[in-house]
């Protein structure tokens, strides 16, 4: 896909500032992933600086991984400001379906904010969509490609957004068309925060292209970087460091050689 390679170059030329309201577990790895890729991360959630920070950011990433009574209002306020300013907003509903608080928080943000991309695994996306009566329930352990395609399409339509259902194959849809991305490696599941990092990388690409292509670009680049990392470091600790290295090293030529992306009309 030509646009993935071009977006990578454009991202590095523009060095977008990506504001993350994310969880404690992944702040460091997310920031390092963005820096390695060529974006600028900022982790800012204080209520008193949100207006200033959102106004200068190129995109906002909201990740609900470690919710509490202080962070939720900050997430909601930031999403409202970003919507008013028409900034790209990427929502990662970490653990939606596991508790009522997580599901309710994700749904509230989806209901009032103009979310550009909703990125989660099958169970998380099914959970928020299930609350709207569109799915049979949450089952992230066992699903087939047709179910993932339908889920991505239905979530995009229901929430008027781009839905990225990530797994062994990533499915990204705007409700009208869908991309299947087969890049990545199972070792990603052995390192905490890799899904969260991919969400923030989508945020960086959202600063240089429309949501559908931004999501495809981010997931493709991250997936290729993971494949290359595993070829050099097949164990979790060194693999994580090598992912940073390949986010830094990946270029247009490697994207053209390694991208496994297919587009389907719905």
Swiss-Prot record:
Q: Which reaction does this chain catalyze? A: 5-(2-hydroxyethyl)-4-methylthiazole + ATP = 4-methyl-5-(2-phosphooxyethyl)-thiazole + ADP + H(+)
The cross-references to InterPro entries, in alphabetical order and at most eight, read:
Hyethyz_kinase, Ribokinase-like
Q: Does the keyword Cell wall biogenesis/degradation apply?
A: no
List residues binding substrate. 43, 193
Cystine crosslinks: none
Its EC number is 2.7.1.50
Functional pathway: Cofactor biosynthesis; thiamine diphosphate biosynthesis; 4-methyl-5-(2-phosphoethyl)-thiazole from 5-(2-hydroxyethyl)-4-methylthiazole: step 1/1
Q: Where does ATP bind?
A: 119, 166
Q: Which cofactor does it need?
A: Mg(2+)
The entry lists its GO molecular-function terms as:
ATP binding; hydroxyethylthiazole kinase activity; magnesium ion binding
Q: Which UniProt keywords apply?
A: ATP-binding, Kinase, Magnesium, Metal-binding, Nucleotide-binding, Thiamine biosynthesis, Transferase
SUPFAM superfamilies linked to this entry:
Ribokinase-like
User: Biological process GO terms, please?
Assistant: thiamine biosynthetic process; thiamine diphosphate biosynthetic process
Please report which protein family the annotation says this sequence is part of: Belongs to the Thz kinase family.
**What is the role of the protein in this entry?**
Catalyzes the phosphorylation of the hydroxyl group of 4-methyl-5-beta-hydroxyethylthiazole (THZ).
Please give the name of this protein: Hydroxyethylthiazole kinase
Where does this protein come from, organism-wise?
Methanococcus maripaludis (strain C5 / ATCC BAA-1333)
Lineage, opening ranks: Archaea, Methanobacteriati, Methanobacteriota, Methanomada group, Methanococci
């Amino acid at each position: 896909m030509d646009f993935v390679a071009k977006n990578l170059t454009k991202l590095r030329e523009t060095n977008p500032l990506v504001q993350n309201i994310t969880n404690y577990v992944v702040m460091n790895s997310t920031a390092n992933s963005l820096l390695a890729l060529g974006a600028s991360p900022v982790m800012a959630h204080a209520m008193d600086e949100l207006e200033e920070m959102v106004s200068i950011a190129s995109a906002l990433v909201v990740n609900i991984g470690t919710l509490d009574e202080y962070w939720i209002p900050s997430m909601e306020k930031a999403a409202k400001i970003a919507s008013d300013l028409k900034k790209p907003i990427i929502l990662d509903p970490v653990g939606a379906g596991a508790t009522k608080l997580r599901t309710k928080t994700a749904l509230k943000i989806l209901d009032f904010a103009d979310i550009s991309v909703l990125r989660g695994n099958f169970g998380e996306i099914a959970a928020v969509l299930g609350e709207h009566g569109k799915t049979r329930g949450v089952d992230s352990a066992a699903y087939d490609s047709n179910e993932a395609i339908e889920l991505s399409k239905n979530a995009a339509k229901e929430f008027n957004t781009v839905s990225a259902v990530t797994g062994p194959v990533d499915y990204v849809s705007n409700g009208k068309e869908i991309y299947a991305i087969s890049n990545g490696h199972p070792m990603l599941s052995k390192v905490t925060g890799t899904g969260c990092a991919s969400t923030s990388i989508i945020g960086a690409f959202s600063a240089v292209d429309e949501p559908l292509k931004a999501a495809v670009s981010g997931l493709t680049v991250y997936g290729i970087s993971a494949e290359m990392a595993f070829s050099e470091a097949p164990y979790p600790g060194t693999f994580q460091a090598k992912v940073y290295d390949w986010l830094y090293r990946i270029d247009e030529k490697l994207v053209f050689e390694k991208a496994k992306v297919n587009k389907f009309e719905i």
